[in-house]
Amino acid sequence: MLTNRQIKILQTIVEEFIKTNQPVGSKRILELLNMKISSATIRNESATLEHEGYLEKQHTSSGRTPSTKGYRYYVDNIMKLDSADYTRLKIYLNQLLDLRKYDIDKTINYASEIISELTKMTAVVIKKQNIKDIKLKKIELILLSEFLASVLFIFSDGDVQNKMFNLKDVALSDLKIAIKLFSDVLVDVKLDEIDQYLNDLKHQLFLSIKQYDYVLNTFINTILESKNEQKETHGMRYMLENPEFNDTNKLKNAVKLVEQLSPFDWFNIAYESNKNMNKIAIKIGNEIDQINDDISMIATELKIGNSSTVLTLVGPKRVDYNQVNQLMNLIIEIINTKEN
């Protein structure tokens, strides 16, 4: 458990690093903190925070930066909505949107463009069809050759989706096990309720097959992507402008993540948040995966009548979480106001 002083130091380092993208040393912390403590005390407390995994130190002579654990603590325990900032942003957004001019879909897309510009993050808007009454009815396996299999997903509305599997990538026996597990758990479940079963399904797959992550993602994406209406992306250019993505491989991974974003990612990142009754889901660094340790994802689902739209922001781990959180809450409020 962190002390009040350690929390203040962690908050100072997180917020200063977000602003400057430079490691924060004890001298700068002392300048920013409104506390009567010595540089030696700050160094000792910072060393403790580093030892406990909240901070990282790139070089022996440099200051410290937040780790994924440090950002997570900040998001969960420190950041709060500032009512003055919230009101200012609300007036600004409403002026830009001029709500009378747009229907809900256009409002969401335009608001996403504005939020992307304000946060310098890439915004992905996925509008989902009304799938309230559609159920998964059956999953069938067809062996096409020694190295190729087809999995058919059959829905209550008569739609059939086909996914091909190279048996060099995933064993036939694993596919059969996965189909049985999916059939046992998800057949006759409404598609908009699938997220309630994912955690249990993921655990069962983990215990039963080798390529459990790949199979789970592929199956869920095939089930859900067929029911998408549209996907729009705003602000891809900000990927190029963020210094975190100067490394070509990191940039490629970030772009790939955005291009492949699907309804499953919403279910995946929202699970913990929904458990805690949060409207906004935040995934940071290696909480997404090990490859994308420098990335953050913030998402919310906007319910409009019987349909819904998922808005996801993707950017570096070093983002202004407080600002993003306020903007996401604002768009939820604006859409709810417009719908009513």
From Swiss-Prot:
The keyword Transcription regulation applies. Gene3D superfamilies: 3.30.450.40, Heat-inducible transcription repressor hrca homolog, domain 3 (3.30.390.60), Winged helix-like DNA-binding domain superfamily/Winged helix DNA-binding domain (1.10.10.10). One of its GO terms (biological process) is negative regulation of DNA-templated transcription. It holds the Pfam family HrcA. One of its GO terms (molecular function) is DNA binding. Negative regulator of class I heat shock genes (grpE-dnaK-dnaJ and groELS operons). Prevents heat-shock induction of these operons. Belongs to the HrcA family. This is Heat-inducible transcription repressor HrcA.
